[in-house]
Amino acid sequence: MSDDSKITGNSAALERTPVPASVETRWWWIRHAPVINPENRIYGRGDLDADCNDAALYDGLAAMLPDDALWLASPLRRTHQTAAAIHGADGRHERARQPIIEPDFVEQDFGEWQGLSWAELEARDEKRYHRFWLAPAHQSPPGGESFDFLVDRVAGAIARLTEAHAGQDIVAVAHGGPIRAALAFALGIDAERALGFAIANCSVTRLDHFSDPDQQGGIWRVSMVNQLPGRVRRR
């Protein structure tokens, strides 16, 4: 073999197919404002109003969020009221005025448990106890859905929307259950373990998706969980 052929061979080895640039899609999850629920009943999918009177809180939220994001909300009014309060804080987040409704981001369906007080629920089903949620992830309330099912529902919507809006910022105003479900999907953890996440009203959870040609479904990074306004600055 000649020296020229060796050089040609070595050069060819260095000429690899370029790897496509990774596309980052950032999800900004916001749990809705506190509901007006003086009797402290299980509300789940109940369409209760939210208390959005804390102006300083929404100023802080507005400062955390990116400009020109796609805004999504569940079908329930408390998520839309929360989005409107964020828009009203500085007028900058124009798309928050009319967020796109995403049915798959609605709260878990608690079936016959919805509307009960906690004492009534205990009397009806003493075995359903869970330290952080209404029931274990696998258990379906009578006439409702399990948290396992909720995770599958939310995961499918996230995958669909991440593909459709790759490279964008997506703000999703939703509920405690769907945000825990999003964490389960991004981290690839069991639904039961995801119930251990604390998700406060008006907190922000950010999940970043990176496309990866070598890994189907891409890679997820958790940038913040349950972050309340006033502790971080908008990027």
Region locations from a protein language model:
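Phosphate-handling substructures
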Residues: 49, 89-155, 224-226, 234
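GST superfamily/GST-like fold recognition
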Residues: 176-180
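Active-site-proximal alpha-helix that buttresses catalytic centers in soluble enzyme cores
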Residues: 2-12, 22-94
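Short beta-strand scaffold positions
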Residues: 73-74, 152, 173-174
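Generic structural signal for well-ordered alpha-helical scaffold segments
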Residues: 59-63, 151, 155-163
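Generic beta-sheet signal
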Residues: 27, 69, 168-174
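Acidic, low-complexity terminal tails and accessory targeting/binding regions
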Residues: 2-26, 88, 108-120, 163, ...
